[in-house]
Amino acid sequence: MQTLGHHYHALVIGSHGAIGRALLEAITADPNCALATGLSRATHAGFELTDEASMAQAAESLKADAPFDLIIDATGALTIDGHGPEKTLGALDAAKLQRSFEINAIGPALLIKHFAPLLAKERSLYAKLSARVGSISDNHKGGWYGYRASKAALNMFLQTAAIEIQRKRPQAVVVALQPGTVASSLSGPFAGGHDVITPEVSTEGLLQTLDATEAKPGAQFLDYRGQTITW
């Protein structure tokens, strides 16, 4: 990372997953990074996306490492409680939809609430892993109801949060990132027909994309190759 200067501080939330782990390893290896911190259930006992109190406690415990120049939220799930994405209207279930929104939209929104205040006042980056299927205008195949809808809701949270964050931090960049179809436990059962990449390839592209992203009003929606995705 070149645009954050020397001695930048970074935080990866969800650092125990395939992409989160690869991101943390790559950032730690960056000679310009002075501090790379991971946050997950493995590093902070009791931390849960469905428990706001645990998020607040984690944020409080990391204040000593702030301000952070880079925060990446790598949380999220496609298969939840053993249930994959719905393919038809007939498969919709209220409880399963609620769980998808809790993990993929509500939890990440609350993370922004508690961790955005830890961003540096100068150029800083808040990035959240999203998904191309969260694009409303790019939905031409249907299916995956809960996952699509939760990611679309996440994108709206990011756009709305970006407006508020940039009032106090005009140089802040808020980005929804599409990491590609990464070889992981999340994507494995659904990777058919897609070009599967390793977490390391995805991470390299994501960090290059973030490094090249300039501050613009509102959030941006980009893939790991730096290409803009329509909302």
Protein language model annotation of sequence segments:
Residues S61-T75, I80:
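A glycine-rich helix->loop->beta "capping" turn
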Residues A172, A176, S184, P189-W231:
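C-terminal helical subdomain
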Residues I13-A29:
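N-terminal Rossmann NAD(P)H-binding glycine-rich loop of SDR-like oxidoreductase domains
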Residues L111-F115, L119, F157-L158:
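Hydrophobic positions on the long internal alpha-helix
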Residues A77-D81, P85-F101, R123-Q159, I163-K168:
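Catalytic loop of short-chain dehydrogenase/reductase
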Residues E25, A109, A152-I163, E200-L207:
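Conserved active-site helix of classical SDR/Rossmann-fold NAD(P)-dependent CH-OH oxidoreductases
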Residues L39-Q57, L62:
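Rossmann-fold cofactor-recognition segment
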